[in-house]
Amino acid sequence: MVFLREKEGPSGGSGRRIILWPAYFDSTLPRRLGRRVPRDMGVPSPKPEDVAEAARRAGFEAVVEESSYPRLWWRVRRRIVVLAPEDVSKTDIIKAVATELRKIAAARRKRS
């Protein structure tokens, strides 16, 4: 739940940096381990690249960085840094990304 306010975002644009962790969208995790969306809005074990792609489809700039999620520190994971306008809340961003992530997961299931 870390967000930093900076003048420069991931690609040099202005806005607010929002940190998104794949655990926010993982339907296999309980909320106490970091899931931030309802189970039916999540996907099982989302990949950081898919979360970043979902953020881009939702209209945000996104960059994947190496880091470990504090609640699951023993797992080496990556985080997604999203550049967001000041007037958009983190909750709204998470919901928008979750919606796009479900579409990506559904398309992947259809291809398999």
From Swiss-Prot:
This is Signal recognition particle 19 kDa protein. Belongs to the SRP19 family. One of its GO terms (molecular function) is 7S RNA binding. HAMAP family: SRP19. The gene is srp19. It comes from the Archaea. Coiled coil: none annotated. Part of the signal recognition particle protein translocation system, which is composed of SRP and FtsY. Archaeal SRP consists of a 7S RNA molecule of 300 nucleotides and two protein subunits: SRP54 and SRP19. InterPro entries: Signal_recog_particle_SRP19, SRP19-like_sf, SRP19_arc-type. Keywords: Cytoplasm, Ribonucleoprotein, RNA-binding, Signal recognition particle.
